Regions:
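GST-like fold's C-terminal all-alpha helical module
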Residues: 100-213
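GST-like domain detector, emphasizing the conserved glutathione-binding G-site
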Residues: 1-133, 245
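Hydrophobic/basic alpha-helical segments enriched in Actinobacteria
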Residues: 27-28, 35, 52, 140, ...
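Short runs of predominantly hydrophobic/aromatic residues within well-ordered alpha helices
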Residues: 64, 89-92, 101, 190-191, ...
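Short His-centered aromatic/hydrophobic patch
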Residues: 197-245
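Short acidic (Asp/Glu) and glycine-rich catalytic loops that position anionic groups and cofactors
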Residues: 46-50, 147-149, 174, 217-218
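A non-catalytic, amphipathic alpha-helix used as a structural packing/dimerization or gating element
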Residues: 88-91, 95, 160-167, 171, ...
Length: 246
């Protein structure tokens, strides 16, 4: 059975899982859905209401970090994502999953969904089933409002999330201050992959930015944020990790 990855195309948690599978040499089929419809694909595959979900012959893997663990067990990554001699990888991944991912999603989506309506429609319909794309177009501006409401994407939330992003980036800046190549030393681990992928909405490495039509298509306020975050040590690190390992 070919594993099947259920995703929202531009989700950074889905990008994390996609990256791990591809780097791990796992052949898989990706089933992409628009927001609001992704839960049907997730539940229909035996997962919960969120994506990514990986469907395998061994069962259903419901979280992005658990997908990395599955790749360690069943794939062929050049180096293990969770090496047994690097216990700090676990704590870093947990921090990025809990604190960074929700914050960058809120900030990135806040600005992306306020872009030109034609751009927003293109973002929400790219690579999804035709019937979902038609439904998105029928819903028009209603769907972005539903997304903003469901994820609590508002001015106050963005302010809190911006503070959270700055705190996580400061932690990463400090770890990198000694000149290390990766967050835990010399080898690439789940910590590096998780940080780089979940920083994606505010750093926009070219590989990830294609999901948004390319960095040149981003709304101006988001471009300003991306430029500022790329100028930090942590932001430059995320870009380098993408360039080297993606």
């Amino acid at each position: 059975m070919t594993p099947r990855l259920v995703t929202i195309p531009y989700s950074h948690y889905c990008e994390k899982a996609r990256w791990a599978l591809e780097r791990g040499g796992v052949t898989f089929a990706e089933e992409m859905h628009a927001p609001l419809f992704s839960w049907r694909g997730a539940l229909g595959s035996g997962g919960g209401r969120t994506v990514p979900v990986l469907v395998t012959e061994d069962g259903v893997v419901k979280e992005s970090t658990d997908i990395l663990r599955w790749v360690d067990a069943h794939g062929r990554p050049p180096e293990p994502y969770f090496p047994p001699d690097r216990p700090e990888v676990e704590s870093l991944v947990s921090m990025f999953d809990r604190r960074l991912g929700p914050a960058t999603r809120r900030v990135g989506y806040f600005h992306a969904l306020r872009g030109d309506p034609a751009y927003v429609e293109e973002l929400l319909t790219a690579d999804v089933p035709a019937w979902e794309a038609r439904a998105v177009r029928i819903l028009g501006s209603v769907l972005p409002r539903i997304i903003r409401s469901g994820l609590k994407i508002d001015e106050a939330g963005v302010a809190r999330s911006s503070t959270a992003i700055e705190a996580v980036f400061a932690t990463v800046n400090e770890r990198l201050a000694d000149g290390r190549k990766t967050l835990t030393g010399d080898s690439f681990t789940a910590a590096d992959l998780t940080f780089a992928s979940l920083a994606g909405p505010v750093v926009m490495p070219p590989t990830y930015a294609t999901r948004f039509g390319g960095a040149h298509r981003l709304p101006a306020p988001l471009v300003a944020i991306v430029d500022g975050m790329r100028a930090t040590r942590a932001g430059a690190f995320a870009m380098r990790i993408y360039e080297t390992y993606r």
